[in-house]
């Protein structure tokens, strides 16, 4: 629910009043679902899990060179 509101706010440049109205509408819909006895699923994490260790200097430079070569950018050799 929050993610949808946030995406809508960003995509449509909603003002505070519009966002509050849409949040109230979402809460009304959620209340109706609960009152009907519908089971509400557990929230799903949508943030990616960032893993791994940072690259060392040599690995970082190699990665930059790879990206430059892939896209044909100037200075492809490091």
Swiss-Prot record:
A GO BP term here is: DNA replication initiation
Which Pfam families has this protein been placed in? Phage_lambda_P
Which residue positions does the secretion signal occupy? none
- InterPro entries reported in the protein's UniProt record: P-like
Coiled coil spans: none
**Family, as annotated:** Belongs to the phage P protein family.
Q: Additional comments on file? A: Encoded by the cryptic lambdoid prophage DLP12.
Q: What is this protein called?
A: Putative protein PeaD
Native source species: Escherichia coli (strain K12)
What gene name is listed for this protein?
peaD
